[in-house]
Amino acid sequence: PLLNDAVWARGDNFVTRPGVHDIYPFFHSIGGTVTYHRDRYWSHLDDRRAVAVYLPPSYEENRAKRYPILFMQDGQNLFDPGQATFGVAWRVDAALDHLACEGGITEALVVAPYSSDDGRMDEYTPTRDPGRRRGGRADAYLDFLLHELKPWVVDNFRTTGLAERVAIAGSSLGGLLSLYAAWTRPREFWCCGAFSPSLWWDGQRLMRDIETGRIPNEDLKIYLDSGDRGPGADGMPLTRRLRDILMEKSWELDSNLCYVLGEGHEHREAAWAERVHRAFAFLLE
């Protein structure tokens, strides 16, 4: 569409059938914004935790549009290198801005709680690992996402609504958590992104559960990746094995499953930053 017969809309073309349809173009914005909500108390966690929220390019310009929610873990590492644990951020906002303005994705809100300094291992793992004597609070953390954080997002931002399913993504233990969430709560999560997931946790328990369990949701989209350098080749043998298990269970590559190998990539933020656009292009197409 054209604005005042002069300015073309950004993003993708709108393909419709004859009839009346609602479309939500935007014309001037070229970048989204990240808002930070710091030192907020969350009763489900009994803790104060910062949350970063990315608002896509069209958010301020088109006030009628509503957006799906993508939960991402380790929010401190996603946007601002100055806040990142190791000084390197994924630049999630830049990746999403580019894809949105090129018309490559459905715009979404990214809601990214910061991880706990001392509780991350417990909150991101579904079972207790006897070797580490830690873990097993993933269900409590997912309850926080779904029953406290999600209602807060719906109340404060324009989303598709409380009843709609959400997406989830993360790296390392956050990738393990994302797979677990989508596999065990298909009514709440419709897709997941697992960057270098820690499939080794608790004797590969989650991967064994996926291999022997029933398919929870045939329309579940899964993005799965790893590098191939560093200790354990960044878990590449296990991620490839999980890819094969999913394909045996009827997932199809480039349909509802995307597998990416980052050649020369190690288990670090810089590598996930290089691959994140591939995940967004697949999950939010």
Model-derived segments and spans:
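A short loop-to-beta-strand scaffold at the N-terminal edge of the catalytic core in hydrolase folds
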Residues: 45-61
